[in-house]
Amino acid sequence: VNDPALSMTCEWWKQLFGESEGKEDKGLLPMDTCYSEDLHSLGQFVQDGSPILFETFLSLRDSGSSYVLHPDDVNDGFSYVDGKDFSEINKAAYDATLSAHSKRFPCLIMEMDRMDEETFGSLFYFFQFACYVSCNITGVNPFDQNGVEDYKRDMFRLLGK
């Protein structure tokens, strides 16, 4: 994601796909990154590591907020962003990241106008349906969680439950 407003949606998405698909040595490992925050940590792997992934870019066309960086007297090397809105800076980071990453592996793009109730509901429905279809294609039951039950059983035993 390139907008922090979507980060908790990604936490839900990780649980949905990890818990539904991750069975019987099948499924994809879901992870999320919030660009530009994660460009140096996970971005390094994406750019130069093993190309074992595909990436979904999830973004909002209208973040619903605006903040313009005002010039100051500090010579910090960032004067090139003076007068620019954060949304413009985030869009440049998004475009540059998509351009670089799409040279190495497939990138899916999901852009939404805004994050309102209708869009949020549509996004949830889309991912739930996609997860269900994926599980059916790979032949796993999306509704059980045997792997989770293993650690819970051990934890409860260790705690005397």
Describe the role of every protein-language-model region:
Residues 1-161:
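A SIS-like phosphosugar-recognition module
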